[in-house]
């Protein structure tokens, strides 16, 4: 009887969600880019009357670009502009028979170039802007700073983006450790946990930015990923039933499948500082001031090393905001990016 009830419940759920029209299946255009064994999904949505396309590049590596659409900040941008969301290889809903030989930063830069060319071919009369978040900031910096790729765009938005892995691992350490004494002194503190962080860094003074996951756990415990989790959850309800049953999303969207630490050791050595000097287009470094994942000093570092004229580059740090302004501070996120696009389109 219990199994029958479950089957009936699932049937009713499927019926309910299938009776409603889903934005994911009715809005925009959905297609794939196949390259070197990877079949990468691309969703173009938003305001097709706009002359502007904002190509987004997700973080991780190993996250999913389609998830940007669930963030209120990106939804507001979709009202004004066309937006491109896509999943990188080894990420999100990407399929295919690609192998570990393609799990390297240069291949991801090549994939990004293919995506840009595909968008240019399908929408030849549009003005392009590029946005990279977290690892996507690092990826877009590496891409823009090579082979004159920045000439394809009117502007670059670096959203809490990485750039120099070794430096950022140390900045995370400097962000985390000064907060531990106060945490240890709090009434009822979990002293074992907080002391463990101190001990871990003593044993691992120079962690890998990509191969060591522990610092990211510590940042999250200190609200450096999401500044206020309660507010975040209230403002960002995720429509899981709709995503699973009435969208192009598959269950693989919820599974991190980027690989093992030993497969990405070379990623810890990424430094795209030289590429920054080759980028001369307008640039906006948009950051959560309280970001502990990619601390806000990185925004200043990127600004200082960019080849862009000072009159066309700026750093904006949003208070009481962690690693995701698009979800934590959507109004400020939208206002800053919209103003940037309107200025340089």
Question: What is the meaning of each model-derived region?
Answer:
Residues 63-73:
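The serine-hydrolase catalytic nucleophile loop
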Residues 188-274, 281:
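Alpha/beta-hydrolase
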Residues 125-171:
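Conserved hydrolase catalytic core segment
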Residues 292-298:
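Conserved alpha/beta-hydrolase "acid-adjacent" motif
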Residues 109-127:
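Conserved acidic catalytic loop of the alpha/beta-hydrolase fold
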Residues 321-330, 334:
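Catalytic histidine-centered segment of alpha/beta-hydrolase-like enzymes
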Residues 78-95:
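Conserved alpha/beta-hydrolase
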Residues 279, 285-287, 291:
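Short beta-strand/loop motif that positions the catalytic acidic residue
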């Amino acid at each position: 009887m219990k199994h029958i009830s479950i089957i009936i419940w699932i049937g009713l759920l499927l019926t309910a969600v299938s009776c409603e029209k889903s934005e994911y299946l009715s809005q925009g255009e959905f297609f794939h880019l196949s390259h070197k064994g990877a079949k990468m999904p691309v969703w173009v949505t938003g305001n097709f009357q706009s002359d502007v396309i904002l190509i987004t590049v997700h973080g991780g590596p190993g996250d999913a670009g389609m998830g940007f659409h669930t963030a209120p900040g990106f939804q507001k941008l979709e009202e004004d502009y066309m937006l491109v969301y896509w999943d990188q290889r080894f990420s999100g809903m990407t399929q295919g028979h690609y192998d570990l030989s393609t799990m390297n930063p240069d291949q991801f830069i090549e994939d990004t170039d293919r995506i840009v060319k595909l968008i240019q071919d399908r929408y030849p009369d549009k003005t392009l802007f590029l946005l990279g978040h977290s690892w996507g900031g690092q990826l877009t910096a590496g891409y823009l700073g090579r082979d004159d790729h920045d000439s394809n765009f009117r502007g670059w938005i670096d959203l809490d983006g990485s750039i120099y892995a070794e430096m950022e691992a140390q900045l995370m350490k400097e962000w985390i450790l000064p907060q531990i004494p106060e945490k240890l002194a709090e009434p009822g503190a979990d002293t074992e946990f907080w002391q463990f962080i101190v001990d871990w860094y003593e044993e691992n003074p120079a962690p890998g930015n990509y191969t060591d996951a522990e610092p990211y756990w510590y940042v999250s415990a200190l609200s450096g990923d999401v500044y206020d989790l309660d507010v975040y959850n209230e403002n960002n309800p995720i429509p899981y039933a709709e995503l699973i049953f009435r969208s192009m999303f598959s269950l693989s969207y919820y599974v991190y499948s980027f690989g093992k630490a030993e497969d990405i050791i070379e990623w810890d050595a990424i430094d795209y500082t030289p590429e920054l000097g080759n980028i001369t287009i307008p640039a906006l470094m948009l950051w959560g001031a309280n970001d502990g994942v990619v601390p806000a000093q990185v925004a200043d570092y990127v600004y200082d090393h960019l080849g862009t004229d000072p009159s066309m580059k700026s750093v904006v740090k949003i208070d009481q905001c962690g690693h995701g302004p698009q979800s934590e501070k959507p109004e400020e996120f939208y206002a800053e990016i919209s103003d940037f696009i309107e200025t340089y389109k």
